[in-house]
UniProtKB/Swiss-Prot annotation:
Cited function: Core subunit of the mitochondrial membrane respiratory chain NADH dehydrogenase (Complex I) which catalyzes electron transfer from NADH through the respiratory chain, using ubiquinone as an electron acceptor. Essential for the catalytic activity and assembly of complex I.
Family: Belongs to the complex I subunit 1 family.
Membrane topology: Multi-pass membrane protein
Species of origin: Balaenoptera physalus (Fin whale)
EC number: 7.1.1.2
Protein name, UniProt field: NADH-ubiquinone oxidoreductase chain 1
Annotated PROSITE patterns: COMPLEX1_ND1_1, COMPLEX1_ND1_2
Keyword Transmembrane listed: yes
Any one GO molecular function term: NADH dehydrogenase (ubiquinone) activity
Xref: Pfam families: NADHdh (PF00146)
Entry-linked InterPro entries: NADH_UbQ_OxRdtase_su1/FPO, NADH_UbQ_OxRdtase_su1_CS
Protein keywords: Electron transport, Membrane, Mitochondrion, Mitochondrion inner membrane, NAD, Respiratory chain, Translocase, Transmembrane, Transmembrane helix, Transport, Ubiquinone
Gene: MT-ND1
Length: 318
């Protein structure tokens, strides 16, 4: 029975990822005054399936000088971790109801760094290695602010369980009292998922395509799936944290529909940002975090800790 539950979580995620690639190409196409994919199926709707068949039927090439085992393990690990991170998300009922769901997700996203590092190192290519080192430095850096912002939000929530955020936000979305945190959180999620304007890992002019430059066919598709699954997951987490959805136990489908609409709107903004903004320089990327975001998030975190004590109250015990 538990296996069926896992499959009913994983298959829709993979399907959503497949169509997200199509939506991205369509939106970027229309923003650049062209059509986007429109040949395969009606209005190009079957394009993701054509891409999947093409990728998985090609021969997975492997550089002669690469470290075979690690080269193969890295993409599998990337996708496994990306899918595992979905398990504590309440939609409205999580796959595994954890007391420390938020910490679990942070730990999993930290482990995802290893798949990037291994893929870059095992490829035995200077471009892949530099791309991997950039990606790792960026991901680790932005995780710091993500963790501090999460802590600040959880101080208002009074619990590490994600499900209780729906109860906390019945009266008011946390977006309103903590909008600076929400803005920094959104920008940090862009950087965490290596999306434009923070896609420094795949600077075509200098690194060809980043840490996955030596990958082809199936393993490349696994990295691709992991990246897009992370994008949807991060946006869903943003919707749960800051745009709390009202949960009526008698009608849980309403919660799911509401959450999905918010997640889709956030994902659209990811694509809109990609079409609008040029790539940051690497030093600007690091300055933004260490000189701007970190002091601000620390100050706001201290504020969220001290305010309840100052007003002689405690966080809500939900």
């Amino acid at each position: 029975m538990f296996m069926i539950n896992i499959l009913t979580l994983i298959l829709p995620i993979l399907l959503a990822v497949a169509f997200l690639t199509l939506v991205e190409r369509k939106i970027l196409g229309y923003m650049q005054f062209r059509k986007g994919p429109n040949i395969v199926g009606p209005h190009g709707l079957l394009q993701p399936f054509a891409d999947a068949i093409k990728l998985f039927t090609k021969e997975p090439l492997r550089p002669a000088t690469s470290s075979t085992t690690m080269f193969i393990i890295a993409p599998v690990l990337a996708l496994t971790l990306a899918l595992t991170m979905w398990s504590p998300l309440p939609m409205p009922y999580p796959l595994i109801n954890m007391n420390l769901g938020v910490l679990f997700m942070l730990a999993m996203s930290s482990l995802a760094v290893y798949s990037i590092l291994w893929s870059g190192w095992a490829s035995n290519s200077k471009y892949a290695l530099i791309g991997a080192l950039r990606a790792v430095a960026q991901t680790i850096s932005y995780e710091v602010t993500l963790a501090i912002i999460l802590l600040s939000v959880l101080l208002m929530n009074g619990s590490y369980t994600l499900s209780t955020l729906a109860t906390t936000q019945e009266q008011l979305w946390l977006l309103f009292p903590s909008w600076p945190l929400a803005m920094m959180w959104f920008i940090s999620t862009l950087a965490e998922t290596n999306r434009a304007p923070f896609d420094l890992t795949e600077g075509e002019s200098e690194l060809v395509s980043g840490f996955n430059v030596e990958y082809a066919a199936g393993p490349f598709a696994l990295f691709f799936l992991a990246e897009y699954a992370n994008i949807i997951m991060m946006n869903m987490l943003t919707a749960i944290l800051f745009l709390g959805t009202f949960h009526n136990p008698h009608n849980p489908e309403l919660y799911t529909a509401n959450l999905i609409i918010k997640t889709l709107l956030l994902t659209m903004s990811f694509l809109w940002i990609r079409a609008s903004y040029p790539r940051f320089r690497y030093d600007q990327l690091m300055h933004l975090l260490w000189k701007n975001f970190l002091p601000l998030t620390l100050a706001l975190c201290m504020w969220h800790i001290s305010l309840p004590i100052m007003t002689a109250s405690i966080p809500p015990q939900t």
